[in-house]
Amino acid sequence: MKYLALLLTILFFFQVDAMAQPTKKEPSGYKIGSIATDFKLQNVDGNMVSLQDYEKAKGFIICFTCNHCPFSIANESRLISLDERYKEVGYPVIAINPNDPAINEDDSFEKMITRAEEKGFTFPYLFDEGQRVFPQYGATKTPHIYLLQKTKKGLEVKYIGAIDNSSRDEDEVTERYLEDALNALLDGKEIEVKETKAIGCSIKVDKS
């Protein structure tokens, strides 16, 4: 009887301890197959931009990026190249700065304008004012890629992650994840690698 009481006591404490442990939170944001909603954000040219403006587009290369992050800077030329090649076949680049400029003034809208002019961006560079868009996507880094395709269901998420397997040096790229995904969509084939880890700087959020 003593053994039974002891066993019940041990089981009780295990149960209480398990209840006290925080549950693992599911990552929020879009997953492969999710349907992305549209947004309307200000571009560096002063115009408001939404995805519905692109009637002839087959989809979009959404890239969360910023002005100051060395990983973002290292990928700017790659984004320009991707935009120049793939917007002609229906997949333009849409870049979005998700950072709060109150945390890092280098990410201000004014400095976005300067950066876009200096680098010669061929794509819209939008400011996520109020930080409402990036949480919907689930972006955590800059740069962070979301490849969308127009389907009967809506804008379907087809690829999430990095542009390629070299976050800094383009000369060391051996796997081009985003290009492979785009080419698969254009060829009507299944994407082999649908998700990779985004490598970059954490998105700067005002936690006050």
Label each PLM-derived region with a short phrase.
Residues 57-59, 88-93, 120-124, 142:
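Loop/turn elements at helix/coil->beta-strand transitions in domains of secreted/extracellular proteins
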Residues 1-24:
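Bacterial Sec-dependent N-terminal signal peptides
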Residues 73-118, 129-135:
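Structural microenvironment flanking redox-active thiols in thiol-disulfide oxidoreductases
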